[in-house]
Each structure stands twice: as structure tokens, then as C-alpha cells.
Amino acid sequence: MIGPKAYIHSDRLKQNIWNIRRQIGERMLMVVVKADGYGHGAINVASVLAGEPGIIFCVFTIAEAKELREGGISNKILIFSRMQREWLDQTIEYDLWVNAAAMEDLNALREFHNNTGACPVVHLKFDT
């Protein structure tokens, strides 16, 4: 293959997380592993950091979130894409966080809760 290559060194990745951790303390830290870990394998990258305290993994699609869960990742996972009514049941099954960006999303969550008694953790996205 011709072109640039990027190498991920797990020890350096962990050191970078600890450097950030020294600045933010014990707050939760969101680590983006969407697009297959930007070509490095989402499960590979997530596995390196899964044992670190306070890590939330962020992906773009529910398929990526399910891939992490099925790959053994137990950390909290936030789906960046706008919540879709048709996959709310899977967010409960896989213990995923959703991104609500409109009143329509909140209404769908209320309806889902009224029908099932369950509701995923919600990240509210506001355009300012």
C-alpha cells in the first residue's frame, strides 16, 4: 500500500489518556472510536482503554455500538447519530446511550417509556 500509515501504540495511547486524566481529574472522558476506530479497528482501540476508569466510548451508529458490545466492551457507549425510534429497544438490550437533538426525540423517548417502562440514558444535543 502506498500512502501514509498510522501506527497506534497501546502504551502511548494509555499514557495520553492518563495525561488528559491529570488535567480533568475523575470526570468521565469520552473516547471516539467511530468509523472502525478510524481504520485501526474499533474493538482493538477500545480494548486497550476499556479497563481505564471513567471511559465512555462514542460511536456514530447503533451498528458500531453493537459491535463494541458483542466484542466484549462493557464501558458506557454513546451513539452520536440522532436517535431513531425504531432502534430504541436495542439501546436497552445493549445498554447504550442515545443522542436526543429535537423535541421529537424527547417525545419518542416518552412514548417508548410509557410503552415499555424503560428508557435509555439520554445525551441532550443543543445547537447554539
What is each residue range found by the language model?
Residues 4-8, 12-15, 24-128:
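Active-site-proximal beta-alpha core segment in soluble small-molecule metabolic enzymes
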Residues 1:
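Gly-rich Lys/Arg/Thr-decorated short loops/hinges at beta-loop-alpha junctions or inter-strand turns
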Residues 21:
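N-terminal nucleotide-binding beta1-loop-alpha1 segment
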